[in-house]
């Protein structure tokens, strides 16, 4: 059993001495603030008087030690039965029971979402960048059901008399298995502090990934997020257990999506995907070999939509949407996005050297996701130049970027219709704009009012 006072700091093997000093000072500040928050809890005195112990756990403690801010406060309270604890919490704020229900409809009665009625306390949270909704839980302890398999074999029991050590030992990786009491004591049974200091991601136990195979993706995510190294035994355990990710009955795709949502934009995506491939997780998850080319493209994935397409780029166009549907999500918005990217990338390939149609397809991709024009290996160096022109507004990426626009353009089109004795059809405005846009893409005219006006006055096919 290992306990540490609040003075333990993050050093990190990848930081310069100046960066380390700054990080250490920030770590001290954040840990001190977290202790102050725990001390300021409205219900603290009554819970302690009832025999309770209060601990901040998980990410917020890990991040404070590392000198990083966090917006979620998770608390474990032991020593007080749930009914009594819930009654106490309800005196001081809005308490909502969020206890889990098992497959037989039985609740475990161990979790509450709490929002304090105390405005001053909520201001303290806000000033520290922490959401006012706090997750409060009783300690849990995992046990195995030998008649079941995978994560279903793990029974998570809730009991107010379990220790904080019991609760920490059920966590996924050591850097998440750390707690902080309101007295400023850090509770660490698994050398979490050493792993944080040395930049290591290590499984809490030999069974961590058997208990829940999604933890392998989570381990990769944290390694990529913090630029930590997976320790040798954890690497070995991931390689051994990677095939467990293929069982979609045990692991619904919604859980994969949740992990990817937490990964995108918050991690070194290029490194994360390379780890997924090198450790055999990619093939186990998706049942195919990767064909997406350069790992560096994933650094540009800013959304789960982009990421979902990039993971399968290079596969047959007809298979990409199916791979996303079968392995990641049925969400209509994501699937429609992936279908659109597939369609426009196919149009880029089909256009070949046809400048007009290629630029139209590139514009369509750009309007969906500017980053795709820097990542897709179907896009050549000239296409990337075009993407830069879109970004700098040197080339219109759509009708709204054509320089001749607004009421002036509308009145010009209506005047042209009148001169040619045609019906004042407002739909002709969009048709004229598209006609001009195509001419700009084809290098027939520049994107300026005079060129566009002269072109439309002398090329009347848009009126037909």
Labelled PLM ranges:
Residues 2-464:
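Catalytic cores of the polymerase beta-like nucleotidyltransferase superfamily
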């Amino acid at each position: 059993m290992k306990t540490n006072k609040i003075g333990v700091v993050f050093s990190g093997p990848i930081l310069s001495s100046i960066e380390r000093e700054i990080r250490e000072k920030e770590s001290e500040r954040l840990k001190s603030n977290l202790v102050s928050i725990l001390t300021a809890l409205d219900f603290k005195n009554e819970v302690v008087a009832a025999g309770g112990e209060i601990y901040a756990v998980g990410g917020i403690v890990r991040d404070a030690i590392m000198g990083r801010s966090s917006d979620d406060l998770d608390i474990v309270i032991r020593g007080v039965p749930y009914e009594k604890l819930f009654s106490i919490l309800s005196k001081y704020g809005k308490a909502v029971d969020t206890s889990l229900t098992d497959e037989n409809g039985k609740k475990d009665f161990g979790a509450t979402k709490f929002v304090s009625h105390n405005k001053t306390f909520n201001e303290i949270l806000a000033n520290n960048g922490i959401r006012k909704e706090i997750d409060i839980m009783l300690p849990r302890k995992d046990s195995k059901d030998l008649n079941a398999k995978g994560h279903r074999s793990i029974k998570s029991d809730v009991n107010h008399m379990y220790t904080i050590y019991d609760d920490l030992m059920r966590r996924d990786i050591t850097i998440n298995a750390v707690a902080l009491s309101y007295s400023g004591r850090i509770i660490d049974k698994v050398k979490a502090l050493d792993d944080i200091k040395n930049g290591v991601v290590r499984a809490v136990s030999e069974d961590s990934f058997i208990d829940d195979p999604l933890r392998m993706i989570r381990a990769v995510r944290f390694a990529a997020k913090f630029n930590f190294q997976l320790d040798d035994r954890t690497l070995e355990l991931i390689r051994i257990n990677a095939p467990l990710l293929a069982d979609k009955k045990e692991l619904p795709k919604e859980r994969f999506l949740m992990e990817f949502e937490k990964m995108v934009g918050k991690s070194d995506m290029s490194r994360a995907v390379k780890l997924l491939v090198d450790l055999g997780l990619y093939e186990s998850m998706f049942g195919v070999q990767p064909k997406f080319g350069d790992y560096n493209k994933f650094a540009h994935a800013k959304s789960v939509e982009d990421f979902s397409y990039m993971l399968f780029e290079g596969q047959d166009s007809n298979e990409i949407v199916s791979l996303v549907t079968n392995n990641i999500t049925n969400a209509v918005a994501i699937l429609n996005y992936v279908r659109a990217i597939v369609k426009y990338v196919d149009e880029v390939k089909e256009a070949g050297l046809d400048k007009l149609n290629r630029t139209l397809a590139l514009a369509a991709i750009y309007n969906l996701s500017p980053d795709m024009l820097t990542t897709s290996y179907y896009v050549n160096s000239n296409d990337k130049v075009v993407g830069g022109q879109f970004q700098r507004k040197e080339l219109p990426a759509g009708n709204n970027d054509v320089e001749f626009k607004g009421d002036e353009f509308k009145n010009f089109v209506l005047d042209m219709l009148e001169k040619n004795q045609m019906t004042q059809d407002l739909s002709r405005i969009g048709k004229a704009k598209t006609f001009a846009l195509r001419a700009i893409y084809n290098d027939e005219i520049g994107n300026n009012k005079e060129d566009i006006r002269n072109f439309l006055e002398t090329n009347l096919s848009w009126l037909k």
